[in-house]
Regions:
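Alpha-solenoid helical repeat scaffolds
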Residues: 18, 22, 55, 89, ...
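Start-of-helix register in tetratricopeptide repeats
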Residues: 32, 65-66, 98-100, 132-134, ...
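Structural register within alpha-helical repeat arrays
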Residues: 36-37, 71, 103-105, 138-139, ...
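Residue-level signature for tetratricopeptide repeat
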Residues: 39-40, 74, 106-109, 142, ...
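Structural motif corresponding to the intra-repeat A-B loop/turn of tetratricopeptide repeats
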Residues: 44, 78, 110-112, 146
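TPR-repeat structural position
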Residues: 47, 81, 113-115, 149
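Single-residue signature of alpha-solenoid repeat helices
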Residues: 50, 84, 116-118, 152
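Short coil turns that delineate tetratricopeptide repeat
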Residues: 62, 95-96, 128-130, 163-164
Length: 176
C-alpha cells in the first residue's frame, strides 16, 4: 500500500466493494484484494466493516488460505483462541508463514518460549534475504506483546539498517 499505484488501486477496490455491497449487487472480488480492504478497515478502526467484509469473503472464498488466516487472527484478537486454533489447524498449507507465526504466538502467549524458539528456528531460512527479515519484525512484535522484551530485542536488533521497514523495527526497539 506504500506506492501511489497501490493507494490508487486500493481506493478503487474499496469504492467498488462498498458500492456493490450498498446496492446488494452480486459481484466477484479476489481474496487478496478483499484482505487488503479488510486490513484497511482494521487500521481505520472500522471493525463492523471489517467483520462484514470477512463474512462476504468467507462466502466467496471459503477455502482460501489468506481468508482463513485473517479470520483466525480476528478470532484471536477477540480472545477466541480455541476457535482460531481450529481454523489454523484446518489450513492445508501448514508451512504458511502466517500459520507458523500463529503457532509461535500461541506458544509465547502460553509462556512456552523454548517451544516457540524451536518452531522459529525450524522456519527461519538458513540464509536471510531482505524479505526474510519480516520474520524478525513479526517475532519482535509478538514477544513485545507478551512482555518478553529481551527475546524481542534478540530478533529486532538483527534487522539490518537498510531493511525497508527498519523505522518500525526502531520503534519496537525503543518500546522494548
Amino acid at each position: 500500500m506504500g506506492t501511489p499505484y497501490m493507494d490508487k488501486y486500493l481506493k478503487e477496490a474499496i469504492a467498488e466493494y462498498e458500492q456493490k455491497i450498498e446496492t446488494g449487487e452480486d459481484f466477484y472480488m479476489d481474496a487478496s484484494t478483499l484482505m487488503d480492504i479488510e486490513e484497511y478497515y482494521e487500521k481505520s478502526n472500522r471493525k463492523y466493516d471489517a467483520e462484514r467484509l470477512m463474512r462476504f469473503a468467507e462466502k466467496l472464498h471459503p477455502d482460501n488460505e489468506e481468508v482463513l488466516v485473517v479470520k483466525a487472527y480476528q478470532l484471536k484478537g477477540d480472545g477466541k483462541w480455541n476457535e482460531a486454533m481450529g481454523i489454523i489447524k484446518g489450513i492445508a498449507n501448514q508451512a504458511n508463514r502466517d500459520v507458523q507465526l500463529f503457532y509461535i504466538e500461541w506458544d509465547v502467549a502460553c509462556s512456552r518460549l523454548d517451544k516457540a524458539e524451536v518452531r522459529t528456528q525450524h522456519n527461519l531460512p538458513a540464509v536471510m534475504n531482505d524479505n526474510d527479515y519480516d520474520w524478525y519484525l513479526d517475532l519482535g512484535e509478538i514477544y513485545l506483546d507478551y512482555g518478553f522484551q529481551k527475546r524481542a530485542l534478540k530478533y529486532l536488533e538483527q534487522i539490518p539498517k537498510n531493511y525497508q521497514f527498519r523505522s518500525r523495527a526502531d520503534e519496537l526497539i525503543a518500546e522494548a
